[in-house]
């Protein structure tokens, strides 16, 4: 039996067959090798040509094709038969990387025999590739009519199969104008009534593609099937567009004529209410318009038909300057004065789009010039703001009386054409309008003159022309509806040259209705050049106040203009408070204007700025306090300036750093300055307390703050704390001696220790140690009484806050139990009560002593950690108690025969002990098991295993994990906690110390020698254990070299800019003298970068001028989109 090929899978898989071997070549093999190698025993000549074509094979390999694809594309029918006979039927429809089957490849290469053979073998003709194209679509696209015929004759072929965008093969045939293929498809049952994704029928595609032969076949076939030509040619798609609309879009005159001859309705409208005529008018297709108008037989006025925007054909032609078309439309009766939905006539629309041929044509034809759009503008309003202005019109038109009368016509806002020309800055239009004796004092509804507009938009040449012939300064100083003069508007927008011109012409420094001067407006925008012009002219205007008491400094600070603030300070502007008691520095801080604050800090008037505030203002406090709250990074910079290193080398012994504390000394300095009548009380260490309040760790860790606290500690803190600790030890040490010297349980009184035996009930008085014991008892008693007095005084001082501190409750317990312990000195009390109180007293005495030590840095941080870990334990008490109850009661039920578990209370205590690791497995569980004392051994050991897993493993690890996490958190914020305690200690001490003493020990600065020891050997040893351990920080290295270089480059650029401006003015003068006409004469836009930026911000605002400006800058070109077929 003849062996065939084994099943062929995807390329790049090895196929082994008897007689035929197909090897896919991997990517790692040399590209010079054959991509595919087919060895066939016998019949080698038949495949010789196929194997030799390496270039094609390489291409096929890249496209991931299999041998059947190659054979189908090359027309190798015998090889295809050989491959198919040795494989399964699936190989017929195998796809390559693009989704193409062998039938696709055969159709694409116009291999008719391959197509026939594949179809005869059962290939599926309805499979589509990635581009949604079937073999029939590919054949139609390539115009392979024989292949089309073969495919359509096959019974399995779906002739109406949809491809990309829902297009059938019939539609693709119309796009190619292949009438022969169309005839074949129609004969085989292709549907003309099937539409694509956009609702287009084949008749639409034929009209758009200009396929006249296909169109004739389609109409004839439709007529044969009951659709008249007129009905068929007026089919519409989803957009209600007819074939005539699409034919006009393509611009094919013959197709349009064919559509009209077959009854296409010219007055049919699509969704946008546009007829095909409107499309043609937009394109400027005069021949098409003439054809359609001459072919129209309806009763309506087709020439003046309007679209959805109420625009006629003449509007469309005027918009795009189609002069010939407009002239033809006028000749056939087009209404030259019709208006669209926005009230625009063709004349206004042509003027707005700079279609000057149309404008002059319409004026010649007698178009009305007094028609206004919905904004009240006539055509002259739009003409004057175009480049070259009125020069675009013929000279004879400007002599017409009805056009001259328009120069004073106002729009809805009361603006005349002169206002428009001044706003846009067209000197030619301004000169022409002034030549008609137009009044420059005309006002708009918001009381703005043309000079207001020119000044607002920086039109320097226009301002010069307007001010050229004035005899008084009334125009210069007139205010608009808001009281703003041209000087205000020019300063507000940063036009320094205009400001300089206005000031030279006599403009006054007036205030608007809000009390704002020109300097207020310039400072609000941060225009330093404009501010300099104003300040150089009138220096006294720096201190002018508005209605809220704000100066120009307030405005510049609020908007964050640091350079403007620096300039005003350099011009010695007064630092004043507004009506809200806020200086410019308060406003900058509240608005978080970092650059403004940093600029003020670096200014030489910083100390003056710092002192301007009121002590009784709740929201505008001392600027230092506000800086800590709102801008801590600026406070850090200020503290950096308080560190002044010496000029010596850092490794030298004489190298020192001076720490200035003047910005941390608010309490003392303010106490001296606050008037006695003002009820203002400042807390000691106010600045540091504000840092603690707002959690400013980086500021508290700053070297200046650390040195400040160290100075306080050395001045009085260490002494006071040691005195407090010493007074506490007066009770602690005697109490400790009493507990150590006297045997617990023995009674004692003032006479001595009473030694008694429980067997004989005899008592013996020990008088040998009676005197020292008596002294210790008296000291404990007196220290406790002293403690009582101290606590009572603190209650009156701290009031409610006293009861919020748990340390105070602890001291009451200590003093009470201590007095009870030594009460036998005066009264006889039972010994058991005496020693129980003694145990409590000595415990809390030493625990409270531990809290005293947390004031010291080296050991205090560990005490804080111990406190945090204890709080973590308390948070887990809920879980802890429930586990204790669960296992304790369970063990009571199972092990109640043992003494340790005999009662529920004892069982709970024993379980608690087991939680700490004292499980006692042998005595409690193992030996009772061997003695058969366990009533429920399995349950008992199961409970033991559960206890071991939950408590020693899970619960303890949980507590350890929480403790480790809290320790890491405490270490992270250890600095803040330690310094906060130091600040609290010094604050409380300064509240109690007299002012004269504080003035004596307080220092405004200190000098530290980092390379020298600060204390003697004994003191260093003592400070190592108890005192603050300084971690010196380097002085911030502020390298100003880069800043200086940048500043030099800045000044060089300013010099170059000034030089270029002078050269520009010189060139302009030369051009004027030589009477050279240049397009630049019409440009009136001399703006700096900041001026242009401000102008862009203004133009982005919602305004009625926006679409006019856009039309002036660029002429819009209409691009009509058509559907993709």
Curated annotation (Swiss-Prot):
Annotated knockout phenotype: Mice display normal cold sensitivity and unimpaired auditory function, suggesting that this channel is not required for the initial detection of noxious cold or sound. However, they exhibit pronounced deficits in bradykinin-evoked nociceptor excitation and pain hypersensitivity.
Glycosylation site positions: 749, 755
BP term (GO), one: thermoception
Disulfide bonds: 193-666, 463-666, 609-622, 622-666, 634-859
Site (Important residue for activation by the scorpion wasabi receptor toxin): 635, 647
Site description Crucial for calcium permeation, residues in chain: 918
Tissue: Expressed in inner ear (at protein level). Specifically expressed in a subset of nociceptive neurons. Expressed in the same neurons that TRPV1. In contrast, it is not expressed in neurons expressing TRPM8. Expressed in the superior cervical ganglion of vagus nerve. Expressed in the inferior ganglion (nodose ganglion) of vagus nerve. Expressed in dorsal root ganglia neurons.
Alphabetized InterPro entries for the sequence: Ankyrin_rpt, Ankyrin_rpt-contain_sf, Ion_trans_dom, TRP_cation_channel
Protein name: Transient receptor potential cation channel subfamily A member 1
Annotated organism of origin: Mus musculus
